């Protein structure tokens, strides 16, 4: 298989004046080469498409990418990693005799050779395939999508990025002397993606990412705590970190969670009434339920055979939407050139539709939803979520809390995992007791678990208020930046199981 991951990479273990000079010079070289775009990529893709069709392929899809990627890690004010690289290459998918062949290559001039390799792989795979792959018909689009940004991450000096990270580190340490360690990670990407298919689509879209992530530890006597925070945008440039995800905002958010855990009362284990806040209900929507509605996974999930059936309490709706303006998971087209859309996974308690790509839309007999995504040209597009959420209800905050003698309000999570049978376990990094219908003391060492498909029937109320989105990354053999969320949702006593120290 043809693969070319990096054209240029630099990594450093510390930040010194000499190192900075080398990084700055290399960065200018990378920027110049990226901006110049010496190769007319669409012309090359056109010729390769024609070649693939002459070979006899049923369908040919080429996804070319050219971009600049940067990653920096700082551990307690010391830069321990700095990587910059150009990523330029083409993903080739060929359908022949009812089977896929996939090749990725950085050899742009030798694209025909890679197309032929993908074609031969498809022909070989077809020999043992029981059922031929067929694609749902898709309209062809010719479009150029522009990014409207104020500060291209490529144009921001290294010194300014390191100052941002230093300011964030200092903000966190200054919050409380019990903060013991701070790691800050920054990742940016900027470039273009070109999609060309034998069906006639010719689409150019931007590649854009700014991402900031601190991980913070604290200690008070023998008590330890840790918390994380994540901010990202795929529609704004560095101005997102200048004006929204500032060091002051992020620093206060994550430091507060660490200290609340140090001061919190130990959580009780068992089953209690509870309210899950937007970030926690969002991770359930994505991890414990959303993956079940990805059409390539549904057959082995708890949603198998449930289309058209009641799967939740009255009034519960859950969607995945790739069209929400400025959200992390939003794009105009997916990586097959299909327009993104709003997918009503659960509508008024009924499982209504699945997320699809062209292959599985045909296989399960549902519409194209625009959920085919690939991490980069090194990967084939697969069905991925975008912005996954529970829809708002009609209850006020007072209504949700009323009548809870003792329970928990879970505000933010540290991490979690789920299985295809809908079982889940999530670590909570910010939570409070609910006592006599009022918010009480912060708690520590709390986790939640359950079977999400059972928990859906234990929902007793859904807030009518707007909610913040949680941005994150999802792994499914490859990485995708996503958003998740939902309003405050109340669960009955046996809807969620709590793990704690007492």
Predicted regions and their residues:
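N-terminal small-residue-enriched
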Residues: 4-5, 10-17, 22-502
């Amino acid at each position: 298989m043809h693969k070319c991951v990096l054209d240029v990479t630099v990594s450093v273990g510390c930040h010194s004046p000499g190192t900075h000079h080398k990084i700055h010079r290399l960065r200018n070289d990378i920027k110049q080469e990226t901006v110049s775009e010496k190769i007319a990529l669409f012309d090359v893709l056109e010729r390769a498409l024609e070649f693939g069709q002459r070979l006899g392929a049923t369908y040919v899809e080429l996804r070319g990418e050219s971009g600049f990627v940067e990653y920096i890690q700082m551990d307690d004010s010391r830069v321990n990693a700095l990587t910059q690289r150009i990523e330029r290459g083409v993903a080739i998918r060929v359908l022949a005799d009812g089977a896929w062949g996939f090749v990725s290559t950085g050899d742009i001039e030798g694209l025909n050779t890679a197309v032929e390799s993908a074609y031969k792989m498809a022909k070989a795979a077809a020999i043992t395939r029981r059922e031929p792959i067929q694609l749902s018909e898709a309209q062809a689009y010719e479009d150029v999508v522009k990014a409207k940004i104020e500060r291209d991450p490529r144009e921001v000096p290294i010194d300014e990025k390191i100052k941002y990270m230093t300011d964030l580190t200092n903000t966190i340490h200054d919050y409380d002397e019990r903060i013991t360690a701070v790691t800050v990670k920054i990742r940016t990407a900027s470039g273009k993606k070109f999609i060309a298919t034998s069906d006639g689509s010719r689409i150019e879209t931007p590649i854009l990412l700014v991402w900031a992530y601190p991980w913070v530890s604290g200690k008070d006597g023998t008590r330890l705590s840790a918390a994380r925070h994540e901010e990202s945008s795929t529609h704004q440039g560095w101005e997102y970190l200048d004006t929204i995800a500032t060091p002051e905002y992020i620093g206060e958010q994550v430091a507060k969670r660490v200290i609340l855990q140090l001061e919190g009362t130990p959580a009780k284990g068992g089953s209690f009434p509870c309210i899950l806040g937007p970030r926690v209900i969002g991770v359930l929507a994505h991890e414990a339920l959303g993956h079940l509605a990805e059409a390539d996974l549904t057959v082995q999930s708890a949603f198998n055979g449930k289309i058209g059936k009641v799967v939740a309490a009255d009034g519960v709706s859950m969607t995945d939407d790739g069209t929400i303006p400025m959200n992390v998971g939003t794009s105009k087209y997916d990586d097959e050139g299909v327009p993104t859309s709003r997918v009503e996974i659960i509508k008024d308690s009924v499982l209504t539709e699945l997320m699809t790509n062209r292959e599985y839309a045909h296989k399960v007999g549902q519409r194209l939803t625009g959920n085919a995504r690939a991490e980069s040209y090194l990967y084939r597009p697969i069905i991925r979520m975008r912005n996954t959420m529970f829809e708002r209800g009609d209850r006020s905050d007072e209504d949700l809390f009323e009548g809870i003698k003792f329970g928990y309000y879970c505000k933010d999570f540290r991490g979690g995992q789920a299985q295809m049978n809908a079982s889940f376990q999530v670590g909570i990094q910010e939570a409070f007791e609910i006592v006599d219908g009022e918010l009480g003391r912060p708690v520590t060492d709390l986790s939640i678990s359950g079977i999400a498909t059972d928990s859906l029937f234990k929902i007793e109320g859904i807030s009518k208020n707007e909610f913040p989105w949680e941005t994150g990354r999802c792994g499914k053999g490859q990485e995708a930046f996503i958003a998740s969320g939902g309003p405050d949702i109340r669960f009955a006593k046996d809807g969620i199981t709590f793990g704690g120290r007492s």
